Amino acid sequence: MTVGERITLADLPLRDDLRGKSPYGAPQLQVPVRLNTNENPHPPSQALVDDVTRSVGEAAAELHRYPDRDAVALRSDLADYLNLRTGVELSVENLWAANGSNEVLQQLLQAFGGPGRSAIGFVPSYSMHPIIADATRTEWLQALRADDFGLDVDTAVREIAARRPDLVFVTSPNNPSGQSVPLEDLRRLLDAMETGILILDEAYGEFSSQPSGVALIDQYPTKLVVSRTMSKAFAFAGGRLGYLVAAPAVIEAMLLVRLPYHLSSLTQAAARAALRHADDTLASVATLIAERDRVANSLSQLGFRVVPSDANFILFGEFADAPATWRRYLDQGVLIRDVGIPGYLRTTIGLAEENDALLTASARLVETELAATLGAS
């Protein structure tokens, strides 16, 4: 028996604007091939595991003390990493870190959104953006992407000018479609904003062929914040570490809304260890890009429509019934993601043998009624 199980959510004094909402979450199922959450499939090296073990062990000796509430050493390491990756000279004052990029985004909306303010996104895109807007009582606006799921910059500029949102979400590479946004397009969006902040979500930035938007922060210090994560290319999803890059004044704003001691000493120690092994870990990015291209070409040859991707996942279709097709993949031991786009599914790029399993299942499905829009019999 579970204590209190006689009541339901309807019995609680829940905020009216949260009633009828659904929680975020990808299915967590034990299947042979899991390609639904865009993790790096390559496990950490033994050297990294040993470093994390040692570093966390040292931090554990001080567990009776609160952690560094501002995570200064970690933020300094993140600045050093980005200096090398982007060529932009950053300091600890330009970095903020939290428990995953979703907490970063939540803190941004706590500081710059809220009642009476609005945020706009260009959909389909990352589904947590409107959820975080709802949670912070920020009015959520949205505009459609182009038919190929790319960002229609002309439309975006018009929407920004007409609706004057306080926050603009741009995801590059976009999740779930995978396209990156060139710097010249970002400039157009930023120039269209009289006020407000553009949040550039670069969760998959290490995979992108485009330069990071970090290069534009000095030109647009009041308008641009870049959000990033160690959960994807960095193979640190279990560590839960996200961060943002911005002008120092934005970091001051984060101090106003963060919870005390929000990053544990163990998280800080493990993340710093992961950063020390960045070169080894990120060597897998080239392998994943090559696998992405192989899978995309193979799916195209089977007759699927594949959306060109600049990330570690692929959006593909078209299916007569995407939810039923998702289930058919699952029946074959392959878990991918139904992202709610009619006719399309998204697959993470995994290890070569996992990708082969996806392609084998796809070859079977292309001959079924679920792929009727492809002309299959």
UniProtKB/Swiss-Prot annotation:
Pathway membership: Amino-acid biosynthesis; L-histidine biosynthesis; L-histidine from 5-phospho-alpha-D-ribose 1-diphosphate: step 7/9
Cofactor(s) in the UniProt record: pyridoxal 5'-phosphate
Keyword Amino-acid biosynthesis: yes
Pfam families hit by this protein: Aminotran_1_2
Enzyme Commission number(s) from the entry: 2.6.1.9
Keyword terms, alphabetized: Amino-acid biosynthesis, Aminotransferase, Histidine biosynthesis, Pyridoxal phosphate, Transferase
One term of GO molecular function: histidinol-phosphate transaminase activity
One BP annotation, GO: L-histidine biosynthetic process
Disulfide partners: none
Listed PROSITE patterns: AA_TRANSFER_CLASS_2
Catalysed reaction, written as an equation: L-histidinol phosphate + 2-oxoglutarate = 3-(imidazol-4-yl)-2-oxopropyl phosphate + L-glutamate
Keyword match Transferase: yes
Positions carrying N6-(pyridoxal phosphate)lysine: K232
InterPro entries cross-referenced by the UniProt entry: Aminotrans_II_pyridoxalP_BS, Aminotransferase_I/II_large, HisP_aminotrans, PyrdxlP-dep_Trfase, PyrdxlP-dep_Trfase_major, PyrdxlP-dep_Trfase_small
Family: Belongs to the class-II pyridoxal-phosphate-dependent aminotransferase family. Histidinol-phosphate aminotransferase subfamily.
Subunit architecture: Homodimer.
Protein name as catalogued: Histidinol-phosphate aminotransferase
Species annotation: Mycobacterium sp. (strain JLS)
